[in-house]
């Protein structure tokens, strides 16, 4: 589904618990696939597939380190996700304030 905007892909990617666990681990610093797989209940190839989804969603990026690839959180993708969340939160608070104001008008 390549028509989604980047934040939509990010939200979709984070709907999976294993991918959320990977993001949480990477919040502590860069790690290679093997290091990530060590503490997850899935195989190393499965971790690689999850990382591919996270990379497509721009939540992680990678760099070569010898014979390995090291993954880290992608600040650009996380910023887009934060902007999307802030926009949602602002709309929710505005709606709540309007509801409170309208209930006050009824009394």
UniProtKB/Swiss-Prot annotation:
DNA-binding region, as residue ranges, is located at: 33-56
Q: Does the keyword DNA-binding apply?
A: yes
Give the GO molecular function terms.
DNA binding; DNA-binding transcription factor activity
Q: How is its activity regulated?
A: DNA-binding ability is not susceptible to zinc, nickel, cobalt, cadmium, lead, copper and manganese ions.
User: Which keywords has UniProt assigned to this entry?
Assistant: Activator, DNA-binding, Repressor, Transcription, Transcription regulation
HTH arsR-type domain residues are: 1-93
**Expression triggers:** Negatively autoregulated.
Its BP terms in the Gene Ontology are: regulation of DNA-templated transcription
InterPro entries for this protein: ArsR-like_HTH, HTH_ArsR_DNA-bd_dom, HTH_MetalResp_TranReg, WH-like_DNA-bd_sf, WH_DNA-bd_sf
Tree of life domain: Bacteria
Give the PANTHER family listed for this entry.
TRANSCRIPTIONAL REGULATOR, ARSR FAMILY, TRANSCRIPTIONAL REPRESSOR SDPR
Role summary: Involved in the regulation of lipid metabolism and hypoxic response. Positively regulates transcription of various genes, such as phoP, groEL2 and dosR. Negatively regulates its own transcription. Acts by binding to a specific palindromic sequence motif in promoter regions.
Quaternary structure note = Homodimer.
Which NCBIfam families does this one have? HTH_metalloreg (NF033788)
Q: What is this protein called?
A: HTH-type transcriptional regulator Rv2034
Q: Which organism is it from?
A: Mycobacterium tuberculosis (strain ATCC 25618 / H37Rv)
């Amino acid at each position: 589904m390549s028509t989604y905007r980047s934040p939509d892909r990010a939200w979709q990617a984070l709907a999976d618990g294993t991918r959320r666990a990977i993001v949480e681990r990477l919040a502590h610093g860069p790690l290679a696939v093997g290091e990530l797989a060590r503490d997850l209940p899935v195989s190393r190839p499965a971790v690689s597939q999850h990382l591919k989804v996270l990379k497509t969603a721009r939540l992680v990026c990678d760099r070569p380190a010898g014979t390995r690839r090291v993954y880290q959180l992608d600040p650009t993708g996380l910023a887009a996700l934060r902007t999307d969340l802030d926009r949602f939160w602002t709309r929710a608070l505005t709606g709540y304030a309007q509801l409170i104001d309208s209930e006050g008008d009824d009394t």
